[in-house]
Every structure is written in C-alpha cells, then in structure tokens.
C-alpha cells in the first residue's frame, strides 16, 4: 500500500526540523500513545493503542531514522507488531519552505501482514491518513508549546 500526505505547518522549517526529533514532543503528538522512548540516537520504541473499525489492538512500534539531510529530508523504517499482525513501512519525509512556513510531504510504502491483511485497502489507507493527519496536527501544537516554554524559561 502506498500512502502520500501533505501538511502545512504554521512554523519555520528550522523549528519543525529541530522538534521533529524530540522524544517528548513526539510522544505527546502520537495519537493514543501509551509509551515512547528514544533508546539510542534515531531509534524510538513504544506502544500505541490503535482503534480503527475492525482493528483494535495495542501495537509495539519501532521507528528508526535511516537517513537524514538537514533540514529537508528523513527516511524512516517503521515496524509495528500486534496480535492482529504486523506493519512494515519505509517512509520518506520531505520538508521545504513554503509561504514563509514549512510544508511536510510524506511518501510511504506499507506492507501489512496477518489478520489485518484482509481489511480492504481503502479502509486501511483512509485510517492511516487520519492517524497521520492527527499526528501532524498534534505535532504542530506540541512544537508551538515547546517553543513557548523554552522562550518563557529563557526570559526568567
């Protein structure tokens, strides 16, 4: 399954780039995240509760940054495992300046195995887009909050 998604942040690209790697910002941005830690540089592990139509399970996730080009590109390898099956994805994230802010484009190749394999692609694709959309809306809020808190701390 192929997924493509665009999100326009109301933030400069350098801020999005900086905070896109922050463990706390990411944990607070991931919908239904139960746990999320950076185990080594560019390697994250956690658990996410996913409830989409017939899919209802806790997934153990592993995210690895395979490649990055500061401040415009990430390649991620994502693995998610549950009783319902496994999800393997390679995702490319492109960040570019756009109208004084930042536009992020994701292109992902996803392979689903197990019980979830029989779920229609259009349902899985629609659900994946909704999760990604929520993630980046939350991420933008978390980045703004982190920037505000760091500026507030700097002033005091």
Regions found by a protein language model. Name each.
Residues 37-79, 134:
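Glycine-rich portal/gate segments that line the openings of hydrophobic small-molecule binding cavities
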Residues 1-43, 47-49:
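Hydrophobic ligand-binding cavity/cleft-lining segments
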Residues 116-156:
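A conserved amphipathic terminal alpha-helix motif
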Residues 80-127:
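Beta-strand/loop substructures that line and gate deep hydrophobic ligand-binding cavities in soluble
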Residues 2-6, 43-45, 60, 73, ...:
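Intrinsic-disorder/low-complexity, polar/charged segments enriched in Ser/Thr/Lys/Arg/Asp/Glu/Gln
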């Amino acid at each position: 399954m192929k997924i493509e998604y665009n999100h326009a942040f109301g933030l400069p690209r350098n801020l999005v780039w900086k905070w896109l790697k922050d463990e706390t910002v990411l944990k607070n941005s991931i919908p239904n995240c139960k746990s999320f830690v950076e185990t080594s540089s560019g390697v994250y592990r956690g658990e996410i509760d996913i409830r989409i139509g017939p899919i209802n399970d806790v997934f153990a996730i592993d995210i690895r940054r395979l490649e990055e080009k500061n401040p415009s590109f990430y390649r991620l390898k994502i693995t998610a495992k549950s009783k319902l099956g496994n999800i393997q994805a390679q995702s490319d994230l492109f960040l570019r300046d756009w109208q004084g802010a930042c536009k992020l484009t994701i292109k992902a190749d996803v392979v689903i195995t197990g019980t979830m394999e029989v779920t229609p692609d259009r349902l899985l694709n629609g659900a994946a887009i909704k999760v990604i959309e929520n993630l980046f809306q939350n991420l933008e809020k978390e980045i703004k909050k982190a920037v505000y808190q760091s500026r507030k701390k700097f002033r005091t």
